[in-house]
UniProtKB/Swiss-Prot annotation:
Pfam families: DUF188. Belongs to the UPF0178 family. It comes from Vibrio cholerae serotype O1 (strain ATCC 39315 / El Tor Inaba N16961). It comes from the Bacteria. This is UPF0178 protein VC_0881.
Length: 149
C-alpha cells in the first residue's frame, strides 16, 4: 500500500499528520503538487512535482495509483477515479469516499458548479475544524492498521 496526496490544496495540518503516520508505519507517502512541498528527508516520504495545468497532478495520481493504495484528496472526480481503480480515497476533512457515496458527491459537486456558473455565490469551504482533523487522523489510523498491521 502506498499513500498518494493531492498536495496542491492539502492543508498543512493534514500534511503533518500524514508525515507522522508515514514515519510511524514506514508506508510510502508521495505528495504530488505543481509546486515544491517542504518535506522531511525520509526514504518513504517523497515529493513529486508536476507541471502546472488543469488536472495535471490529478492525472499523475490516477496513473500511478494501484488497487489498495490510499489517495488523500478533496477532489471528487479524482476520488471517483481512484475508487474505480480499487484504491481508497480519503478527504482531508475525514470523509472516506466509497463506491456507495461517491456518485452522490459527484452529483452535489455538479449541482454546485451549475449554481456558480449561473452567478450564484456558493462560498468556499469553512476552515478545517478540530473534529475534522481528528476524524481524518482516526480514519487514516484505521486504514493503516488494516493494511500494515
Amino acid at each position: 500500500m502506498k499513500i498518494w496526496v493531492d498536495a496542491d490544496a492539502c492543508p498543512k495540518v493534514i500534511r503533518e499528520t500524514l508525515i507522522r503516520a508515514a514515519e510511524r508505519t514506514g508506508v510510502e507517502c508521495t505528495f504530488v503538487a505543481n509546486h515544491l512541498i517542504p518535506l522531511p528527508k525520509r526514504d518513504n516520504i517523497r515529493a513529486l512535482q508536476v507541471s502546472s495545468g488543469f488536472d495535471i497532478a490529478d492525472n499523475e495520481i490516477v496513473r500511478r495509483t494501484e488497487a489498495g493504495d490510499l489517495v488523500i484528496t478533496a477532489d471528487i472526480p479524482l476520488a471517483d477515479e481512484v475508487i474505480s481503480k480499487g484504491g481508497l480515497a480519503l478527504n482531508p476533512r475525514g470523509e472516506l469516499y466509497t463506491k456507495e457515496t461517491i456518485k452522490a458527491r459527484l452529483n452535489i459537486r455538479d449541482f454546485m458548479d451549475t449554481m456558480r456558473a449561473s452567478g450564484i455565490q456558493t462560498g468556499g469551504p469553512a476552515a478545517l475544524s478540530q473534529t475534522e482533523r481528528r476524524e481524518f487522523a482516526n480514519h487514516l489510523d484505521r486504514i493503516l492498521a488494516k493494511r500494515t498491521g
